[in-house]
Amino acid sequence: MSTLGHQYDNSLVSNAFGFLRLPMNFQPYDSDADWVITGVPFDMATSGRAGGRHGPAAIRQVSTNLAWEHNRFPWNFDMRERLNVVDCGDLVYAFGDAREMSEKLQAHAEKLLAAGKRMLSFGGDHFVTLPLLRAHAKHFGKMALVHFDAHTDTYANGCEFDHGTMFYTAPKEGLIDPNHSVQIGIRTEFDKDNGFTVLDACQVNDRSVDDVIAQVKQIVGDMPVYLTFDIDCLDPAFAPGTGTPVIGGLTSDRAIKLVRGLKDLNIVGMDVVEVAPAYDQSEITALAAATLALEMLYIQAAKKGE
């Protein structure tokens, strides 16, 4: 099958059909799309349970359950009538070649951004965010990061391709400004001197959504924002299908409300990562990821409609 970049794809885990039953467009660069969905079936950088390469396919598959609702509750409008979204399928790269994946993903993102598109990406493990940040920083300059996760991913002792080091590397490369960045839902050890504002899961669960959002807006300001959501930010009761689950996380309800609260930020890129469907129950993790991705698109559509 000829796919993104006119490459033959013999993968068993990618390029089946589009998110929300959207038509596939394997040549999105010259399209009239506002937002382009790209899957990145990569999990070579994971430190825990593998299987994130199946994440994009799982998110798309379960998204058929969301496609029927036109005036989505509680938005009361159809995102597809305000926002032109296309799904360009999955990145094709040589199996086992992490460097090629990283370089191809960055090049793909740079080409889309240069054509005036915005990106919503599906991982894959969280390492895929780093080449996406590199591409976005070239286009938008230094950004703020709004990061939902159980882990800060700011660890300094990892290797070149490691899903726990991206946000140690990104500030060093000048891609993001930690002083204007927020990490939400953290509940594992981290270096308190890394510059990020960390809103741990205990705080986020105990405070009101409005209070948390007000703090996020104050920290981020008017900077361009990259929004990344690692599904293990959710408690394993709501997202068991992930590589490194941690008890004590957010409910899916709270996460959705927090994402909705980000509507007024200048979000220039988004991703949802770390869905590993082999460990899922009744597709609830994939459904949570697909729903969060849809809410991300809705906040863009709501802003466009103002």
From Swiss-Prot:
GO terms for cellular component: cytosol. Mn(2+) 2 binds at residues 149, 151, 230, 232. GO terms for molecular function: agmatinase activity; identical protein binding; manganese ion binding. GO terms for biological process: putrescine biosynthetic process from arginine, via agmatine; spermidine biosynthetic process. Disulfide bonds: none annotated. Its cofactor is Mn(2+). Pathway: Amine and polyamine biosynthesis; putrescine biosynthesis via agmatine pathway; putrescine from agmatine: step 1/1. It catalyses: agmatine + H2O = urea + putrescine. The record marks 163 as: Important for catalytic activity. The expression of auh activity is antagonistically regulated by cyclic AMP and agmatine. In the presence of the cAMP receptor protein, cAMP represses the expression of AUH, while agmatine induces it. Keywords: Hydrolase, Manganese, Metal-binding, Polyamine biosynthesis, Putrescine biosynthesis, Spermidine biosynthesis. Pfam families: Arginase. Its EC number is 3.5.3.11. InterPro entries: Agmatinase (IPR023694), Agmatinase-rel (IPR005925), Ureohydrolase (IPR006035), Ureohydrolase_dom_sf (IPR023696), Ureohydrolase_Mn_BS (IPR020855). Mn(2+) 1 binds at residues 126, 149, 153, 230. Catalyzes the formation of putrescine from agmatine. Belongs to the arginase family. Agmatinase subfamily. NCBIfam families: agmatinase, PRK02190.1. This is Agmatinase. The lineage of its organism: Bacteria, Pseudomonadati, Pseudomonadota, Gammaproteobacteria, Enterobacterales.
